[in-house]
Amino acid sequence: MSTYAVTYRYQASHDELAELRPAHRAWLQSLLEQGAMLASGPLGDFAGALLIFKATDEIELSALLDNDPFDIAGFISERVIEEWNPVFGPFN
């Protein structure tokens, strides 16, 4: 299993995001409970988010992320997936 850093950029309004946020967070919570997601949260400007995942490969992770309610609703304008090698901290 590899660790991946995922960055989202949103194209939805704050109101649109707020309306769908409970479903988005329920989806994230299920991934946390399964051990697929390690951490997530909004970026400082609230125009996107950073998510940390464990996955076999980028293809598997991309397919998983396609199920995000924010993505299904078309709220994500950009999604960047990068393999990450955490040397220090809780994710190594």
Residue ranges of model-derived segments:
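Conserved, structured core segments of small domains
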Residues: 1-92
